[in-house]
Amino acid sequence: MSQDYKTTLHLPATDFPMRGDLPKREPAILERWERDDFYAQLRAHAKGRPLFLLHDGPPYANGQIHLGHAVNKILKDIIIKSKHLDGFDAPYIPGWDCHGLPIEIAIEKKYGKVGVTLDAVQFRQKCREYAAEQIQLQRRDFKRLGIIGDWDAPYKTLDFRFEADEIRALAKIVDKGHLIRGTKPVHWCFDCGSALAEAEIEYTDKISPMVDVAYPALDPSALAAVFNATLPPDVQLAVPIWTTTPWTLPASLAICVGPTLDYVLVEGPTHSGQRRWLILAEALAAKALARYGIAELLIHGSAKGAAMEQHIFAHPFYPDRTIPLLLGNHVSAEDGTGAVHTAPGHGQEDHQVFQQYGLLNRYSAAELNPVDARGVYLSTTPPLGELTLAGLHIWKANPLIVDALRLRGVLLAAAEMHHSYPHCWRHKTPIVFRATPQWFISMEQAALRSAALKAITHVTWYPQWGQARILSMIENRPDWTISRQRTWGVPIPLFVHRHSGAPHPHSAALMRQIADRVQQQGVDIWYSLDQTELLGTEADQYEKITDILDVWFDSGITHEAVLLERGLPKPADLYLEGADQHRGWFQSSLLTGVAMDNAAPYKQCLTHGFTVDQHGRKMSKSLGNGIEPQDIIKTLGADILRLWIASTDYSNEMSLSQEILKRTTDAYRRIRNTARFLLGNLHGFDPTLHLVPLSDMIALDRWIVHRAFELQQTIKAAYTRYDFAEIVQTILNFCSVDLGSLYLDVTKDRLYTMREDAPGRRSAQTAMYHLTAAFVRWIAPILSFTADELWSYLPGDHADNVLFTTWYDGLAPLPPNAPLTAADFDKLLTLRDHVTKVLEPMRANGVIGAALEAEITVAAAADTAARWQPLTEELRFLFITGDVTVTPANTDGFFVSAQATTKAKCARCWHYRADIGAHPTHPELCGRCITNVDGPGEQRHWF
């Protein structure tokens, strides 16, 4: 009767659960972190280390967090935690952006506009309360993601101290000569009733009217002479302009052409039986004439654009307004006619041209910009014939103006155009350029542009294309409009002269005094302040301005209001945000940093892409393809979300779907199962008692420690360059290939069948201890909850949390004089692969069942055979086969053959051995198992 030898085996045993059950287990871990003040402990353990400062860009305090928020915060958290393991003190101070329009809109919906049911002070208080509520909700969700930080003392742009520091930052900028006031065209949203920053604009497709309008020459013969042509007496001469904004024509004050472009004088369409010659850019003439119904290009002359400068034209519908022709380098021959109508109140380039020609002072504010803040023509706007423009909204005026142009005979062509057009990011409505008195940070007055361009080159950009992108933006951006005509924000505390409009000569000093008061009483003090307290006898000569600061200025000065205020160094080591922040926070921070300190406030900038579905479509409720982070956490756990983020190339768009989440869960399961198997085989192992020195380890165990050392070097380098996808892939490959398909499979025999205290078994356990101690650190920044759980099962004495340690120092490379070198193992593993390939058809054809039923013969070159023959007795354990024979052969490589064994199977280790049945007490066991059960135990050297 056969005996049950199972009790003589040392099978894996661990309480570490097979199932992660993350939605239930993570909250308990989070509760413990809260109870133990994990962040404070982390900082205490890191005290005295070099500082690594990742400065948090503030999310807006409005609404639930979405997947983009989760991506951003988790990437930051991975970096912070990896830096702690790398030997740094890496504080993380989260922040919130609290002022601005979205909160105003939320309060207006609930209470009405300012001055209706609430005065401005009450309105701001409601905004403050609303922001505080939103922060609480978002903070809860961020913490649930496993984000570790100073959640009890975050920075908030609504804090009195922050608002005061923001005013002090503005005072510095005033001191440096960067602040100017001017009437310039700025992005304007009629729904907001305010100017918009570049970062508050998004481009969406829009259908616009597209018209070609003729501007008749007032001295046609002189203009024709420029083209060396003689104008017949019965022929009109005009320059057609092409525009998609007919509503701007009442503000049209000039025509611009390109000075170096080639223009031709061509035969145009007749009007009321009268011939008409037109001036068109040569490159666009045929296409333009086709729009006018003319197939043949008949040229009467040619000239450069510069030759037409200062010729005078009639306005298409205001007969008493003369239109000069000016030169503008912004005019191109890409589309249209090569001539653009110029409305300096509604276009930045138009405004610049008028500035260059010194023409701005010739016109009233209403002539430059006849449109009010709501998008309605002013009462002073002249009618267009019988069409009254005053009081008419510009979008309604567009088709009426086109009809009026047609009646007057100056409309050459009209159609509709589908194009990308700027919209307000909040209201999703089209915006315009509108000249209004605003406060600007000048890009030129104190050489801010050139200094910012230089500073960009001293920053490391991830990905590298980020540098070229922001360089292009800074090169081409206009002055920064920092004033807003809203209620909820930090005031621009300037006193301006009642008559000249000039700021008080001691503005910066006054602003600092006001900042001191704001720090104690908040921004309301500015509006209630009796200015005689600060200005004394000058008070009657000055008035306060009521504009507030752009919210991008709020977040743009956090390097001053947060880092300096908390004693942290500038510049920060890293800013990390979405790719849209090249024109947002990265840029506003850069400009304020350079304006104040002549340096960028960051050493490195890293950007991540946006989340899309598996088809590359933006996630949205309307498409029904959105996946919320809260749903992932409830069903799968935060670590699954964290693993997806880490495993994705975040430099591009990040695809997510249920199928991708399933694959991520499978990857997580592989990591968890590997950790569980390692822990299971550490049952009964105490590193203080049983750890085997590296030099005494079995060769295979020593090699896997060497492989782990190599991987740790790779992983550390990848964390340093923020390549988390490489880390995940490296870990998964290690789990599947080095461990799953090789090391763990091979060492099962030793771990299960040897005596508990056998040196060969303790050697394998030592290797697995080293692997687990390193492995838990590798995954800790990414799988924070799982690493915390795994760490608690690691045998031996250690710190309370894996993040209180640094990278594992128990790994080491194989020395060059090792009995089996890394090169030897490369060859042996290649041989092992060949053995597997030889056995596959034998298994498929039923010659053998398991590989243990095969006996292997390896014929190799003499020197290779001589190297491998000492290993012969143990090669069967590496191959997990029956006996292995190595013979020398006349070959450069090696040849593998196999045959089915005729030997009996051991009932305990399942190996097929010739000595089974030789022992009377254990007739079913091989000699090796007998010595492991009843004797001193087997000896192993190699595998």
From Swiss-Prot:
Gene Ontology terms, MF aspect: aminoacyl-tRNA deacylase activity; ATP binding; isoleucine-tRNA ligase activity; tRNA binding; zinc ion binding
Requisite cofactors:
Zn(2+)
- GO biological process: one example: isoleucyl-tRNA aminoacylation
- Keywords recorded for this protein, A-Z: Aminoacyl-tRNA synthetase, ATP-binding, Cytoplasm, Ligase, Metal-binding, Nucleotide-binding, Protein biosynthesis, Zinc
**Pfam families on file:** Anticodon_1, tRNA-synt_1, zf-FPG_IleRS
Motif ('HIGH' region) on chain = 59-69
Q: How is the cofactor bound, as the UniProt entry phrases it? A: Binds 1 zinc ion per subunit.
Q: Where in the cell is it found?
A: Cytoplasm
InterPro entries according to UniProt = aa-tRNA-synth_I_CS (IPR001412), aa-tRNA-synth_Ia (IPR002300), Anticodon_Ile_BEm (IPR033708), Ile-tRNA-ligase (IPR002301), Ile-tRNA-ligase_type1 (IPR023585), Ile-tRNA_ligase (IPR050081), M/V/L/I-tRNA-synth_anticd-bd (IPR013155), Rossmann-like_a/b/a_fold (IPR014729)
Q: Which reaction does it catalyse?
A: tRNA(Ile) + L-isoleucine + ATP = L-isoleucyl-tRNA(Ile) + AMP + diphosphate
Question: Which residues of the sequence carry a binding annotation for Zn(2+)?
Answer: C906, C909, C926, C929
- Which SUPFAM superfamilies does the entry mention? Anticodon-binding domain of a subclass of class I aminoacyl-tRNA synthetases, Nucleotidylyl transferase, ValRS/IleRS/LeuRS editing domain
Q: Which family does it belong to?
A: Belongs to the class-I aminoacyl-tRNA synthetase family. IleS type 1 subfamily.
Task: Read off the domain note.
Answer: IleRS has two distinct active sites: one for aminoacylation and one for editing. The misactivated valine is translocated from the active site to the editing site, which sterically excludes the correctly activated isoleucine. The single editing site contains two valyl binding pockets, one specific for each substrate (Val-AMP or Val-tRNA(Ile)).
Q: How does it assemble?
A: Monomer.
Name of the protein: Isoleucine--tRNA ligase
Source organism of the structure: Xylella fastidiosa (strain Temecula1 / ATCC 700964)
Q: What is the lineage of its organism?
A: Bacteria, Pseudomonadati, Pseudomonadota, Gammaproteobacteria, Lysobacterales
Protein encoded by which gene: ileS
